């Protein structure tokens, strides 16, 4: 994991003759053994150098979404030549086949006796399962690569300077090999939703194309140099994939009796499932428009 500290990204910036590198890369303080982390027997700790005159933002706007797209595309581009064997921080984190396996196991066990209520929803999800598991299948066929991705893309995981310019990507604990769909799709799952992820009124849930266009423009500007034609072609698929995946995860937990996600009320995971599945449907309807816009950027 040390390669993602002050050495790997910093060296890339030096080769690119970047200035102000100390503010554009998180620098981790090494231990006396030379490691960039310390294990106290129970937990891991890291200390990074404070970056002065920096701030995080929470607001998701077309302007901030464009900047996020540029920076995370740049982040992937700088790490594109690193070996995939870097290691998975969370195994199968964004593996759709694995998430479907979890759902099917939950359905078979029906631990909380809730299957009668959700059987029709499970059937709907299963109809699209083969299509939504395409990434893993294409990877096994050698048609789709895995790259080093951040895997937690959001506005608050970047530092900005006092003038609103992007300094660096932060919160690197989920950085690992994945499909580029992880960074592209997961950002738009949250940022492109016009409502909270647990909105009970499904009529309030729509997919925000203005956020999509801004993020896609920034991302493709900085990532198109290394993306394959298939990766670019499948970016709209990524936008569908992540609300679908999250719906599957919420539903599996609901069927299991709410054992994983913290809930605020008895039907919370069920409400979350319906909300994410509605967002998936909205994203699917927007795919032709997404494809047309991405083509215009190339």
Feature annotation, model-predicted:
Residues 11-23, 78:
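Structural motif at the C-terminus of the N-lobe alphaC helix and the adjacent alphaC-beta4 loop
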Residues 19-35:
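Conserved HxN/HPN-centered segment at the entrance to the catalytic loop
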Residues 156-194:
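Catalytic activation segment of kinase domains across protein kinase-like and atypical kinase folds
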Residues 24, 46, 147, 165-168:
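Protein kinase-like catalytic core scaffold
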Residues 54-66, 81-150, 155-163, 241, ...:
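ATP-dependent phospho-/nucleotidyl transfer catalytic cores
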Residues 181-225, 241-260:
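Active-site activation/catalytic loop segments of kinase-like enzymes and analogous catalytic loops
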Residues 2-13:
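Single conserved hydrophobic/aromatic residue that forms the stacking wall/gate
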Residues 30-65:
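Conserved structural core of kinase catalytic domains
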